[in-house]
C-alpha cells in the first residue's frame, strides 16, 4: 500500500516477527506464501526510503526452551534455536532479493559462509545505504529471547519505533483467541505491561524499551497495508510508551 503522498512519521524502524508467523497454512516450518506477503510489504516501505531492521524468531523450526523442559541442556537448545532464526532470515532474504530489495543478514554468531557477522556500525551503514538488514541468531547468548534481541538491536541502531507483528490486532487483557471476553487495549505504558503481566514481549525486552524511551507498536501482521499506516503515524494496533 503506497503512502499516497503522505509523509512518513518514522524513517528507521525495527520490525519483530515470531518464527510462528512464518508457518501460515503449512503447519510447520516456512510457508512461502507468508514469506512472500511479508516481503511485498517490506518492499514498499523500502521503496519509499524507510530504513528497516528485522528480527525474526525461530519457533516455527525449533524452540530450545521447550526441549529444555524435557531434559535437553538449555544452552544447547538455545543455540539450536539461534540456528533456526538464521534459516528464517535466509528465507526472508531470498524473498526480498527476488523482489529487487537489497538485503543483508547479520548474525550474532559466526556463520561467515552464509551471512555477515553482526557489527553495529556496519549495520547502520547498510541501513543508510538503503539496504534492509535482518538480524539473526538473537543476541548470540543463551537464555535471552528474540524479543530481547529485537529491543537490543532497535536501541543499538537508533530505531525510532519497535514494531511487533502478531496474530491479533494489538494487546488484549487476555488471549482473544481463547477468551471471547478479552478486551482490546489501544495504549499502555511500559510499567502497565509489566505490572499486569500482559503477553506483549518478555519483561527484559519491555524494560529495555522503557529505559531507552523506545516506543513499541503491536499490530496484526495479517492486515495488508497495516505497516504503511503505522509508518504514516496512524493509530494502528496498540502503542506501548511512557505516556
UniProtKB/Swiss-Prot annotation:
Subcellular localization: Cytoplasm
Domain of life per record: Bacteria
Region (Involved in allosteric activation by GTP): 24-29
UniProt entry tagged with the keyword Protein biosynthesis: no
Protein EC: 2.7.4.22
GO cellular component: cytosol
One Gene Ontology MF term: UMP kinase activity
One family name in Pfam for this protein: AA_kinase
Coiled-coil parts of chain: none
Subunit text: Homohexamer.
Record protein name field: Uridylate kinase
Organism per entry: Nitrosococcus oceani (strain ATCC 19707 / BCRC 17464 / JCM 30415 / NCIMB 11848 / C-107)
Amino acid at each position: 500500500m503506497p503512502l499516497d503522498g503522505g509523509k512518513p512519521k518514522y524513517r528507521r524502524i525495527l520490525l519483530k516477527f515470531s518464527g510462528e508467523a512464518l508457518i501460515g497454512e503449512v503447519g510447520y516450518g516456512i510457508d512461502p506464501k507468508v514469506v512472500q506477503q511479508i516481503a511485498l510489504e517490506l518492499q514498499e516501505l523500502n521503496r519509499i526510503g524507510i530504513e528497516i531492521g528485522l528480527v525474526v524468531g525461530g519457533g516455527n523450526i525449533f524452540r530450545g526452551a521447550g526441549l529444555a523442559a524435557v531434559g535437553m541442556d538449555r544452552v544447547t537448545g538455545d543455540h539450536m534455536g539461534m540456528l533456526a532464526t538464521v534459516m528464517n532470515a535466509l528465507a526472508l532474504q531470498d524473498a526480498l532479493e527476488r523482489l529487487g530489495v537489497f538485503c543483508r543478514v547479520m548474525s550474532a554468531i559466526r556463520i561467515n559462509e552464509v551471512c555477515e557477522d553482526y557489527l553495529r556500525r556496519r549495520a547502520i551503514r547498510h541501513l543508510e545505504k538503503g539496504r534492509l538488514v535482518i538480524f539473526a541468531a538473537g543476541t548470540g547468548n543463551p537464555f535471552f529471547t528474540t524479543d530481547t534481541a529485537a529491543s537490543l538491536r532497535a536501541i543499538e541502531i537508533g530505531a525510532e519505533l519497535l514494531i511487533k507483528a502478531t496474530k491479533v490486532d494489538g494487546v488484549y487483557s487476555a488471549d482473544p483467541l481463547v477468551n471471547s471476553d478479552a478486551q482490546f487495549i489501544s495504549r499502555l505504558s511500559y510499567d502497565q505491561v509489566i505490572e499486569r503481566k500482559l503477553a506483549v514481549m518478555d519483561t527484559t525486552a519491555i524494560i529495555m524499551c522503557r529505559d531507552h524511551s523506545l516506543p513499541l507498536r503491536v499490530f496484526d501482521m495479517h492486515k495488508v497495508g497495516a505497516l504503511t499506516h503505522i509508518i504514516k503515524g496512524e493509530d494502528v494496533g496498540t502503542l506501548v510508551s511512557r505516556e
